[in-house]
Amino acid sequence: MKEIDEVLKKVKRVHFIGIGGSGMCPLVEILHSKGYEITGSDNNESDTLNRVRALGIPVTLGQRAENIEGAEMIVYTAALLPDNPELCAAKASGIPTFERKEMLGAITRMFDDCICVCGTHGKTTTTSMLTQIFIQAGEDPSAVIGGKLPLTGTNGLVGKSEYMLCEACEFVDTFLSLSPDVCVLLNIDEDHLDYFKTLDNLIASFTKFASMTRKEVIYNGDDANTLRAIAGAKDKKFITFGLKEGNDFRADKIVLEHEFASFDIIKYGENVGRISLGIPGEHNVYNALAAIAAADNAGIPMDKIIACAEAFHGAGRRFEILKRINGITIADDYAHHPRELEATLTTAMGMGFNRVWAVFQPFIYSRTAMLFDDFCRVLSIPDKTVLTEIMGSRERNTYNIYTSQLAEKIPGSVWFNTFEEVADYVVKNVEKGDLVITLGCGDIYKAAKLMIKKLEKQG
């Protein structure tokens, strides 16, 4: 038994530093439902804080040493600085302190059936679709998702069953703190190389995660890197999905339409039904197959799986249509890696719009530098490309990489320092019938909102 599990058995009062973080809120809700007394603090007001307060949980704005008074355990976000006054006070007082990923791991062990969805791309969409299937099929799951599920309007769920559906992120090996009963492995691609350094190291982490899984490992049988990872995992029940012959769950007679995708579901060689997805693109065919295989493995009847999956129309910030105004469609997507951008932009280009505008915010210097050529290639797919400054986040620009260098290599692209400039340029030049899609895992969605405001003023 891990230290955090022992502590949770002994305590009742848990204090969250950074309780307003979107990744913290589902953990707070689940612990609260299990009878723990929760308190928390944050530096900024947010919708998430209001959601926490609605549960009757006291929240302090601002972080001070006295906020931890009475706490028997501290949970903090990975982004917290080591000199945070509450964290320092807790350590000085001998109060057990744990990072968010450790608490998420402990929560996965509170359930008999924890299904963890991992992979470089598609985690949020797949976890969201799977959660919707479980909810609408009457399974009453708990869930921790990396984005908002439109059905519930939240990124977490507290259910009464023993099912826990959890998005499992590989960054800094976060997922190795979890305890999966079932692993759903979507794909593996070069990412987070600032941490993993090499693709081999990244694959090795996924091998560890698959090996930790207690029951079934459901994986993409078409993905070469995934096959390498799975080769190192022994003594598991394996279930494959993909488009190629030989996969246990396969899509056949695929039709990719304007905003939809449909295909026949082939389960162990038998056609078990046709599904029409409310989300576009071949990449979402893979995501749907993964969710279908996981739901089927849990014993949900196929007719229910199909009906529930068809009712799913995407997760927040995953090709999310924000507004159709003056004949112009404004959308937003979380894509920030070349493979994700390629999937999203290729899908967008096939949807019949007059022109497709990609408004991209590069995220972190290391990724931009290491995958520079790939970014230049995929950002040449749309008709128009608009770039913002690189969002450095946790990094300093030791790579001497700048947006202007990307723009030089992408034909016809432009770049701007501010979202205001981006919005002004797009609104001035966009035409009826165009799709404008903001792309990135930072705050580029703010540029989309600015565009909408400016278009509304035009009338």
Regions found by a protein language model. Name each.
Residues D5-V7, I30-Y36, R53, N67, ...:
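Phosphate-binding loop of NTP-binding sites
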Residues V14-F16, I74, I115, P141, ...:
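Conserved hydrophobic helix-helix packing surfaces used for dimerization/oligomerization
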Residues M1-E99, M103, A224, R250-D252, ...:
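N-terminal leader/targeting and accessory segments in enzymes
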Residues I68-M73, E162, E431-D434:
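Short acidic/histidine-rich motifs immediately flanking catalytic phosphotransfer sites
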Residues K2, E6-H15, G23, L27-K34, ...:
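Nucleotide phosphate-binding/pyrophosphate-handling subdomain across enzymes
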Residues Y36-N43, E216-G221, W357-Q361, P382-G392:
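Short internal beta-strands
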Residues K237, C376-K432:
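C-terminal helical cap/extension that packs against the catalytic core
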